[in-house]
């Protein structure tokens, strides 16, 4: 997956979990990359584990489910 669609989150995550992305990363997802719900991104947690994720909702906070 393109590095432009890779986002870093705090803490450790698990498959099936939901992550919330805010701030400038949320703006980048919604306005710069113009991604939409169901689009795929990559999430990297604090343990450097990478997950594929599907966007659930986009606003001031982006919610995505880890696949």
Model-derived features: positions:
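N-terminal positively charged helical leader segments and presequences
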Residues: 1-67
